[in-house]
Design a protein with these regions (language model features):
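Outer-membrane beta-barrel proteins and related beta-barrel translocases across Gram-negative bacteria
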Residues: 1-458
Length: 458
């Protein structure tokens, strides 16, 4: 099928890094792409739509992040600037569930299981389930009264956060913050998935005129009972079989003896001067001049923070290294698979370029890159905004031998495969193509040269 090359007015071409085809028009202002089973069309930076029948998924962005719509199977969610949102669809336990929120004033859920329905109008009256890190929340004229439940622990708040009563399995407590408070949990047991009985440690905590006197004993009934007492900022003491910590005039002086992780640490004051020595941790930090810290799996260094920062994490088969200069101005991330010797790498130099190479050797180079260094691998940014400022794009796939380069939204474009080569320049006024059938040259859209491929030798 013949292709039209008149970029940046219009161009269409095969994809380099995946099976598929792409058409672009009016420079960066419109494109349509078929990538394997995924179909995308967009009018950057205003809107984009992606549909994948193979996964039964759909995505739509309008002035991202102002409005987004996402669907996977029967589950869907749309939102307007994360303040107004609606989601729905079946779950593992419900044939249908719909949620609607106008944050932070109105929350609603309707479910095929009536026990999961709720409505909340803040601050007047409401009941929520599985929201805000709590199993249940009930309130009346919040902060006058609010009740929360997380597993078996129920907390009744009156004039939050000043007074509360708390109870649960083996647990009772109360507080009149910041004047006085006390809470105690007895040692309890539970049966795990292996039908084994596990001990859940208890605790006992109290405070008077917080934060001037606080004391807590945790891990009651276990082999690592922890005692802690503090009167901030005067002192903070922690004693346990695994770890001792002494802090005087926080944050000016702290000493840590961690017998479990096998290191000792001095902070004077934290976080500016930190010294740690031992098998489990070695740190020398004089912030912001320099810092070197490492343990058996992690390394973290900086010099003239935030001018230079280096981090490394090693856990077979992953070896991850990242070098940064001035936060996001320059970033170089390398992730190696130590078992098979493959690696991927991403380099960002804001706002000039971004380059990444995958484990399979595929690479992509883009200039400019205004948001990509801050939000790497972000689908909406790549769909909606990258085409607007990517004045240069280069892609290559060493396994297929395919490569492509594009300047100024295909004002110049070159595509190469092992069997063909195409080059187009200046709205298609110059166009050269060669393949197994021969070579062709057009100037000002007029064919001026054509040659047939030589027949194969017998």
């Amino acid at each position: 099928m013949p292709s039209l090359h008149a970029s940046p007015l219009f161009d269409d071409f095969d994809l380099t890094l995946a099976p598929g085809h792409r058409a672009e028009a009016l420079g960066p202002l419109f494109y349509e792409e078929q990538k394997e089973t995924q179909q995308t069309w967009a009018i950057p930076p205003l809107l984009s739509h992606t549909l994948d029948p193979a996964t039964d998924s759909e995505e739509f962005d309008f002035a991202y992040p102002l409005f987004t719509y996402d669907r996977y199977g029967e589950q869907y969610r749309w939102q307007i600037f994360q303040l107004l949102n609606h989601s729905g669809g079946p779950t593992q336990l419900e044939t249908a569930r719909d949620r609607f929120s106008l944050f932070p004033f109105y929350f609603q859920q309707r479910s095929s299981d009536p026990s999961q329905n709720y409505t909340a109008v803040l601050p007047f009256y409401g009941h929520l389930k599985n929201r805000f890190f709590r199993d249940e929340i009930f309130f009346v004229l919040f902060p006058v009264f609010g009740e929360t439940r997380k597993k078996d622990v129920v907390t009744d708040n009156y004039l939050y956060p000043f007074f509360h009563l708390r109870h649960g399995e083996g647990l009772s407590g109360w507080q009149f913050w910041p004047v006085v408070g006390h809470e105690r949990k007895e040692v309890t047991t539970q049966t795990n998935i292996l039908d084994e009985v596990e001990v859940i440690g208890g605790h006992d905590s109290r405070f008077v005129l917080w934060p001037f006197y606080m004391q807590r004993i945790s891990g009651l009934g276990t082999t690592n009972q922890v005692w802690q007492q503090a009167s901030l900022p005067a002192y903070d003491l922690v004693r346990s079989p695994a770890r001792d910590q002494t802090t005087i005039l926080w944050p000016f002086f702290s000493r840590i003896d961690d017998r479990e992780k096998k290191y000792r640490e001095w902070e004077l004051p934290w976080p500016f001067v930190v010294l740690a020595r031992g098998e489990g941790k070695t740190t020398t930090r004089f912030f912001p001049l320099f810092s070197r810290a490492h343990n058996p799996t992690t390394q973290s260094d900086f010099y003239l923070w935030p001018v230079y920062k280096y981090n490394r994490f090693q856990s077979e088969p992953l070896d991850r290294q990242r070098t940064r200069i001035l936060f996001f101005l320059y970033s170089d991330l390398i992730e190696k698979n130590t078992q098979n010797g493959t690696a991927r790498r991403r380099t960002d130099f804001w706002p000039l370029f971004t380059h990444h190479r995958e484990y399979n050797g595929q690479s992509r180079w883009q200039a400019l890159a205004l948001l990509e260094p801050f939000l790497p691998n972000h689908k909406s940014i790549e769909r909606d905004y990258s085409p607007v400022w990517s004045i240069w794009r280069a892609e290559s796939d060493p396994k297929t031998g395919a490569a492509s380069q594009s300047l100024l939204w295909n004002l110049y474009r070159r595509d190469v495969t092992p069997a063909s080569q195409k080059c187009s320049l200046l709205f298609g006024l110059f166009h050269y193509q060669s393949d197994t059938t021969g070579k062709r040259l057009r100037l000002f859209y007029i064919p001026v040269a054509r040659s047939k491929a030589a027949p194969p030798k017998l």
